[in-house]
């Protein structure tokens, strides 16, 4: 009886050629596991392709609900970005996928997990750290670090030699990752940063200049940092994301073209579409500005940066990330209320916020008189606040500086 390997399978170029390669080079029974995080693929076609290519069994695992509820909404509450721009769509999906791969490996008695991540990318780290977090005894097979295939052109040639149908050509060679949160585009002419990316590559988004000429309004209601209602209607997490993606996509929202610092040390360029996520981030940030005090808000910005780095680096299941979650939860206890946004040709603008726990008081913040704040009080405050700088100036003057 052959040993088994569970392959993280998408039906794309890399994982399609890995099935025959594993059978040839390891003599293993290949179990293909497609973890559905909202790719919008024809899953029956994915299943049939895996079997046709040589898999002995195929798992199609729909984890969209868990992905949105436990991963994406956690990202919204923490307001995480990588290098101030990337909403971490790929990074957020990998820990859940790794967890499910381990569960399938245990159910099947498999000794190995295989993936199609390249030896230059971040995903190899994310998958393997995720697997090790649940079962460090499982073996890892990473073909891109082993085989003689050195480029996507080589991979296409190998696929053709094995009669494997793949969804790319040497002329259309972008590498894409899609889920319910985003689409990423890498490779091809994007590798030269002088090249403007082509809007024809977009999957989820209308180019801003071609978006509709009318303004769209949307109102989101949050409870303790979690989006619950859209335009007054309570929606389950997956439907919430699907609706926001459609609305954001129609209005050209959420396109990012950036050069980022990969975990493995090199820089890479990616184009990201995150229409619904960009809307959620804008609404949540507007609500936080009214409901979180200054010191906590400023400290949370530092926490958010570190949290984003942990997620990017594949450390979702780390003790530090668990500790940061505890901090974030406390900050969200009063982040409840409604945010109205205006969407227009790639722009998201706040059009009103209503929060029952708002720390903003119109009477105090206005230029008029207030029982809690007398304009004359500012004079004493300024004297105390500026005291260190007065002392510094006096000392420098005495020394002749």
UniProtKB/Swiss-Prot annotation:
This protein's pathway: Amino-acid biosynthesis; L-arginine biosynthesis; L-arginine from L-ornithine and carbamoyl phosphate: step 2/3
UniProt-annotated binding residues for L-citrulline: 86, 91, 122, 126, 175, 184, 260, 272
Record PROSITE patterns: ARGININOSUCCIN_SYN_1, ARGININOSUCCIN_SYN_2
EC id: 6.3.4.5
Any one GO molecular-function label of the UniProt entry: argininosuccinate synthase activity
UniProt binding sites for L-aspartate: 118, 122-123
Substrates-to-products reaction catalysed: L-citrulline + L-aspartate + ATP = 2-(N(omega)-L-arginino)succinate + AMP + diphosphate + H(+)
Subunit organization: Homotetramer.
Cross-referenced HAMAP family: Arg_succ_synth_type1
NCBIfam families, alphabetized: argG, PRK00509.1
Family assignment from sequence similarity: Belongs to the argininosuccinate synthase family. Type 1 subfamily.
Protein name: Argininosuccinate synthase
Organism the protein comes from: Clostridium kluyveri (strain ATCC 8527 / DSM 555 / NBRC 12016 / NCIMB 10680 / K1)
